[in-house]
Amino acid sequence: MCTKNQAIGILEEVYIACSSILKEYIKDVYLYGSYARGDYSKESDVDILVTAALDRSELSKFRYALASISSDLSLKHSVTVSLTVKPYDDFMLYSSALPFYSNVIKEGIRYGA
């Protein structure tokens, strides 16, 4: 378990690590779920969503590198870091229609915002 401030620090680490892989394609990075809402417990994972200006097939080329970020940070911080990466266009298209996306926007903490 970590604190909300530590989860926000992990959010920054994810942004830096993903930026080195996705470069200029990275659009947004959100902390969402229980740590963003403040109702986390010792069982909670740190949920992070990254959006990138790439389509699904282009993003799939980076899946192993992105999974490595998640596992490395989980080990470093002794908390499960659940990293989800979505195409930015899909995120924007579905943000008002699908609860997952709308909750990320409504409850999430956007890095750099």
Give the predicted meaning of each segment.
Residues 1-30, 37-42, 53-113:
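Catalytic core of pol beta-like nucleotidyltransferases
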Residues 46-51:
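Short beta-strand->loop micro-motif that forms the acidic, two-metal-ion catalytic signature
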